[in-house]
Amino acid sequence: MARPLRALIFGRFQPFHLGHLKVTKWALEKFDELVLLVGMANESHTVLNPFTAGERIWMMREALKDEGVDLSRIITATVPTMSVYVGHAFYIINLVPKVDSIITRNPVIAQVFHDAGLEVIAPPEFDRNLYRGSYIRKLMLEDGNWRELVPKKVAAIIDEIGGVERLKKAASRD
């Protein structure tokens, strides 16, 4: 039995937004399976990383399911916060099921995974000025219209967990 063609998408997903969704759907047109790797999994309840790894996986799965994505094609994994260098790229490659490529627009991530032997594929840009976690979190803090930038299921989960309030509390710490 031939192994499926598989790619890695590595991100913090704080939160999982429409840009992530578009990249995931684009990648599923090219690969049999995707590994969605949640980075900085040990960090939460901060302005940079307000959501837990479990919440981020929940957001991804619900958004993808709502879009009709076959979740048997999606593998989720987590990795704690670590510095970016080729040794950690090898660690990650051995942490997840075998992958053929990494999909990233981050030049530093691209370089270390290239140095570790993976093919690097840059996805198309999907309105990166809008679909950026830092911008979405800023809108949350300012009571702006962040909901139009995330899948409906993600907005519902953020509401359910009190995510905006959590982010505001994290931002108000001295």
Curated annotation (Swiss-Prot):
HAMAP family for the chain: NMN_adenylyltr (MF_00243)
Biological processes, Gene Ontology terms: NAD biosynthetic process
Ion transport as UniProt keyword: no
Entries under PANTHER family matching the protein: BIFUNCTIONAL NMN ADENYLYLTRANSFERASE_NUDIX HYDROLASE (PTHR21342:SF0), PHOSPHOPANTETHEINE ADENYLYLTRANSFERASE (PTHR21342)
UniProtKB keywords: Nucleotidyltransferase, Transferase
One GO CC term, this protein: cytoplasm
UniProt source species: Archaeoglobus fulgidus (strain ATCC 49558 / DSM 4304 / JCM 9628 / NBRC 100126 / VC-16)
Pfam families per record: CTP_transf_like (PF01467)
GO MF assignments: nicotinamide-nucleotide adenylyltransferase activity
Gene3D superfamilies: HUPs
Signal sequence coordinates: none
Entry-linked CDD domains: NMNAT_Archaea
Sequence similarity: Belongs to the archaeal NMN adenylyltransferase family.
Listed name of the protein: Uncharacterized protein AF_1488
Keyword flag Nucleotidyltransferase: yes
